[in-house]
Amino acid sequence: MGRTLLLLSRPGCGLCREMHTVVERLRGEFSLELVERSIADDPALLERYAHEIPVLLLGETELARHRVAESDLRARLRALGVSEV
């Protein structure tokens, strides 16, 4: 089992689908689990991130917001010492 990424999203969010796709591609390179959580289900998250999604977190560390290039996320994961497969 790898490190867990949390993707904050909401239904119908095109940018969220794009970020999910990028993360899924990188799961083949890194030891990662992905949990996706809709801000629509949590009033506190909705208030905090209403216009900021998608947001990708590793623990308390924000890895990306709105858009992320696969190469940039790969570099961030390596810099944070996430194990490669």
Regions found by a protein language model. Give the residues of each.
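Short glycine-biased active-site loop of nucleotidyltransferases that positions the nucleotide triphosphate
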Residues: L46-R48
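Short helix-capping segments at alpha-helix termini
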Residues: R27-S31
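Structural micro-motif
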Residues: A50-L56
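Local sequence-structure signature of Cys/Sec-based thiol-disulfide redox active-site neighborhoods
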Residues: M1-R25
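Non-catalytic, surface beta->alpha helical segment in thiol-disulfide oxidoreductase systems
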Residues: G59-E84
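Thiol-based oxidoreductase modules, predominantly thioredoxin-like and allied folds used
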Residues: L32-P43
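Proteins that catalyze or organize thiol-disulfide redox chemistry
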Residues: M1-R3, V82-V85
